Regions:
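Intrinsic-disorder/low-complexity, polar/charged segments enriched in Ser/Thr/Lys/Arg/Asp/Glu/Gln
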Residues: 2-8, 47, 61, 74, ...
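A short, structured loop/turn motif at beta-sheet edges
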Residues: 12-16, 43, 67-73, 94-104
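Hydrophobic ligand-binding cavity/cleft-lining segments
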Residues: 1-43
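Beta-strand/loop substructures that line and gate deep hydrophobic ligand-binding cavities in soluble
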Residues: 81-133, 140
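Hydrophobic/aromatic beta-strand elements that line small-molecule binding cavities or substrate pockets
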Residues: 7-9, 61-68, 79, 89-97
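Glycine-rich portal/gate segments that line the openings of hydrophobic small-molecule binding cavities
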Residues: 39-84, 136-145
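Hydrophobic-ligand-binding modules of eukaryotic lipid transfer/binding families
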Residues: 1-10, 132, 140, 144-145
């Protein structure tokens, strides 16, 4: 059984600007309240090192592998806890052009594995609010002149 989370925000910025903010991992400590630290590059096959601070939860470090990096459109990675099939999270950031100088940033994550059903309530309580906080913070940063 899979668990899915979804959060989106409309941003008055170009897809290029949103992509720039999203993939400037070194700057995450300056603005991102959810993924408070990130190292690596947005390149397929790259293994990132991310520090996540779930809302009301304990911080964890995880090492997702970039599956897709389509500039100005999509960044997708896969993180695993312990081993494949235990608790896997495939996270996608999609940038959609809306016109009139706006884009929509959509975060979507699908969790699978033996622990996914057991973690469902915790993901709703701690992780989804983190997505929403990150979206709002990214919006503020991308809309700055």
């Amino acid at each position: 059984m899979a668990k899915q989370l979804h959060a989106q925000v409309d941003i008055r910025a170009t897809p290029e600007r949103v992509w720039e903010v999203l993939t400037d991992f070194a700057a995450y400590p300056e603005w991102n309240p959810f993924i408070t630290e990130a190292r690596g590059t947005a390149r397929v096959g790259e293994r990132l090192t991310n520090r996540m601070q779930p809302v009301g939860g304990r911080g964890i470090t995880f090492r997702p592998t970039v599956l897709e990096a389509d500039p100005r459109r999509r960044l997708r990675w896969l993180g695993r806890l312990v081993a494949p099939g235990i608790f896997d999270g495939e996270h996608t950031f999609t940038i959609q052009q809306l016109g009139d100088g706006q884009v929509r940033l959509v975060q979507h994550e699908q969790f699978r594995g033996l622990l996914a059903p057991l973690m469902a309530k915790s993901l709703d309580r701690h992780t989804l609010p983190g997505f929403e906080l990150m979206n709002q913070a990214l919006k503020r940063r991308a809309e700055q002149p």
